[in-house]
């Protein structure tokens, strides 16, 4: 962020339920942690700060919120960058053995409360380390300060429940919202780790995303070499180069 902040005004937020953000009730349909609700949060933050139009960069769950933000608030999103994700509905529609093993947590996290909550509570930090360690370069990709921030958040049972509600929404109400058929209308950069799960997808990620845009030409992208899921941590120079070229001066 420091490098981007040298050229741009950077607003970095924790999604609702994550980090130090509030953890509001979810509701029976998990709508409180839907990407639509989270996108509305981000739009509200930017309005409060006085930014009517803006570019958005998101990674992982943040990228899914970025996608929904660009759909629900298309008039405000000038351009967006999606880091290391495939569309949620695409993932669920293309599950095979390899994907199920790599993304096992998607199917564990969506189980009804409080089964995942209780199981993770047995040793949350161990589970966090195993989860982070299974992606890309493993725990070595994260410096001590970043890992401590993950651990602090994950030690909070309410934060873990909020995270699980996010995934439960992803398997339910978020898919209903996707079925509404809105399409991306802003220039979209798709970046993925060459060595990660997204990078190993049989269909190139840009080919997956282009049908979800009003004009397929809006979607461009590239693999980040020598990187898995955590692009910034594993290859900052290449990720930053792609982002700065896309975002402009």
Predicted region positions:
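Conserved short acidic donor-positioning loop in nucleotide-sugar-dependent glycosyltransferases
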Residues: 227
